[in-house]
């Protein structure tokens, strides 16, 4: 008999049956940070990148990835996402800038959207890197985390390293 939720009694992987869970309004917000050089920051703001503005492309990539999360993560349930929104902001840091990518995903369903939010910011960061690598291959994608989640049986979660967001 298996003691793990994602393995059957024969010890093989399985997708958990969520049909008995109640459908509730659920939201998840994730964040990913990309450290960039002053040179890249200037190129973006001067609109001199050969591939064009990386942010709209990264935004679309994040939305598309959120919708495809179940195809990327084996035990993730395919769900009908009701909304995905991404945000981008630059913060000055020592030796450059930090691009902070945020994603909020919403659903009325019987499973959460944490993985969808995390997948959205990760795909957006990878797309940003792809759009900008001709100028700066030394970018660092770092600190991907779940900022908050609301709804569901276990209630709300707020990452202890981020302020409570309302």
From Swiss-Prot:
Q: Subunit notes for this chain?
A: Homohexamer; trimer of dimers.
Originating gene: moaC
The family annotation for this protein states:
Belongs to the MoaC family.
Q: What is the species listed in this Swiss-Prot or TrEMBL entry? A: Shouchella clausii (strain KSM-K16)
Q: Which SUPFAM superfamilies match?
A: Molybdenum cofactor biosynthesis protein C, MoaC
Q: Where does substrate bind?
A: 75-77, 115-116
What is the role of the protein in this entry?
A: Catalyzes the conversion of (8S)-3',8-cyclo-7,8-dihydroguanosine 5'-triphosphate to cyclic pyranopterin monophosphate (cPMP).
Protein name from the UniProt record: Cyclic pyranopterin monophosphate synthase
The record, for Pfam families, names:
MoaC
Q: Is Metal-binding tagged as a keyword?
A: no
Task: Name the domain of life this protein comes from.
Answer: Bacteria
Q: Which reaction does it catalyse?
A: (8S)-3',8-cyclo-7,8-dihydroguanosine 5'-triphosphate = cyclic pyranopterin phosphate + diphosphate
Q: What is its EC number?
A: 4.6.1.17
Q: In which pathway does it act?
A: Cofactor biosynthesis; molybdopterin biosynthesis
Q: Which keywords, in A-to-Z order, does the entry hold?
A: Lyase, Molybdenum cofactor biosynthesis
- Give a GO biological-process term: Mo-molybdopterin cofactor biosynthetic process
Enumerate the GO terms in the molecular function aspect. Answer: cyclic pyranopterin monophosphate synthase activity
């Amino acid at each position: 008999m298996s003691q793990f939720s994602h393995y059957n009694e024969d010890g093989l992987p399985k997708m958990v049956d969520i049909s008995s869970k109640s459908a509730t309004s659920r939201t998840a917000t994730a964040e990913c940070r990309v450290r960039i050089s002053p040179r890249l920051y200037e190129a973006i703001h001067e609109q001199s990148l050969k591939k064009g503005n990386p942010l709209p492309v990264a935004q679309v990539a994040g939305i598309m990835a959120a919708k495809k999360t179940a195809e990327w993560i084996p035990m993730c349930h395919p769900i009908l996402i009701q909304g995905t929104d991404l945000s981008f902001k630059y913060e000055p840091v020592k030796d450059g800038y930090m691009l902070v990518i945020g994603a909020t995903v919403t659903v009325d369903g019987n499973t959460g959207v944490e993985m969808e939010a995390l997948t959205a910011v990760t795909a957006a960061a990878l797309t940003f890197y792809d759009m900008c690598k001709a100028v700066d291959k030394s970018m660092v994608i770092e600190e991907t985390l779940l900022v908050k989640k609301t709804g569901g049986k276990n209630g709300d979660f707020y990452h202890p390293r981020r302020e409570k967001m309302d």
